[in-house]
From Swiss-Prot:
InterPro entries per the UniProt record, alphabetical: PRibTrfase_dom (IPR000836), PRTase-like (IPR029057), Upp_B (IPR034332), UPRTase/APRTase (IPR050054), Ura_phspho_trans (IPR005765)
The encoding gene: upp
NCBIfam families in alphabetical order: PRK00129.1, upp
Keywords: Allosteric enzyme, Glycosyltransferase, GTP-binding, Magnesium, Nucleotide-binding, Transferase
Cofactor: Mg(2+)
Annotated cofactor note: Binds 1 Mg(2+) ion per subunit. The magnesium is bound as Mg-PRPP.
Protein name: Uracil phosphoribosyltransferase
Catalysis performed (reactions): UMP + diphosphate = 5-phospho-alpha-D-ribose 1-diphosphate + uracil
Disulfide bonds: none
């Protein structure tokens, strides 16, 4: 599995800001969008382009355009919604597929409860977004679902990943690409990433 920890100074700075314990909901939400945008820039760097001729201000001009990529953004509810706008800043025409999965606080196992996928999912590359890759359970369950529906191409974008989650994801779905702003130390006994960001969903939505 291709794993890319994006070490651009802007990303490192913004993730550092997100680790502040008393960060406001507004600021955390803004930073999640910004880092999601920067990760999208990196994750799409291998998209092929083609030359096309358009009518410019002074006549025909040859320009580069993305070649034949149908994209669907797949936020994992609910926290993934906090990164979605950052992706759409760069790919505003992308279709949105929504997958609802929560993690049982006792077993730490993923529990699917909702999905609404874009049409022709089998023809699209899926950019799956979720702030935290902790145990990997929710991400694995989401990719299982997408594959069942015929999707063949995936890129996973997360703010912070734990080594345990990366290992689990690679074992279950070695064909995906993972882009993360940080690979942290470990999971604690409650399944939270350390040092991590805390509960990203609560911080994005202002809930406890």
């Amino acid at each position: 599995m291709k794993v890319v920890e994006v070490k651009h100074p802007l990303i490192k700075h913004k993730i550092g800001l997100m680790r502040e314990g008393e960060i406001s909901t507004k600021r955390f939400r803004e930073l999640a969008t910004e880092v999601g945008s920067l990760l999208t820039y990196e994750a799409t760097s291998d998209f092929e382009t083609e030359k096309v001729t358009i009518n410019g201000w002074n006549g025909p001009v040859e320009v580069d355009q993305i070649k034949g990529k149908k994209v669907t953004v797949v936020p994992i509810l609910r926290a993934g919604l906090g990164m979605m706008d950052g992706v759409l800043e760069h790919i505003p025409s992308a279709r949105i597929s929504v997958v609802g999965i929560y993690r049982d606080e006792e077993t730490l196992e993923p529990v699917p409860y909702f999905n609404k996928l874009a049409s022709n999912i089998d023809e699209r590359i899926a950019l799956v977004v979720d702030p935290m890759l902790a145990t990997g359970g929710s991400m694995i369950a989401t990719l299982d679902l997408l594959k069942e529906k015929g999707c063949k191409h995936f890129k996973v974008l997360v703010l912070v990943a734990a080594p345990e989650g990366i290992e689990a994801l690679e074992k279950a779905h070695p064909d995906v690409e993972l882009y993360t702003a940080a690979i942290d130390e470990k999971l604690n006994d409650k399944g939270y990433i350390v040092p991590g960001l805390g509960d990203a969903g609560d911080k994005i939505f202002g809930t406890k």
